[in-house]
C-alpha cells in the first residue's frame, strides 16, 4: 500500500508501507507447548523461539505464546523490517490449553487454527 504524507515545503512524498503479515501462503505458525510469562517482550519471546523452539524468527514465521492463566496470548513475527508483537487479552473465557498433552517444545498450527485460537475457540 502506498500513501502520501506532507513533506517540508508543502511537497508530498510517497512511502511504501510493509504488509502486516506478508505472503500468508508461505508463513508457518509455531506455538510454544508450555505456558509463558506474559511479561516477556520482544527479546524474551525471541529467545524462547530460537533457543527452546529451535526456530529462526527472522524467516517471517509466526510464533504464538500463551500465558499460564490462558487469558493472554502474544504472537511474534518479523515483517521484513523489524519484529512485530501482537498481544491479545480475552475479556471473558480462556484460550485453549496448547500444552495439555504435548511431548515437544512446540506445536505447528495451520493459519486457520491460529485464527480460531485467537477468536477463543477450543477446536485445536
Predicted regions and their residues:
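Polybasic/polar functional segments that serve as interface/processing modules
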Residues: 2-124
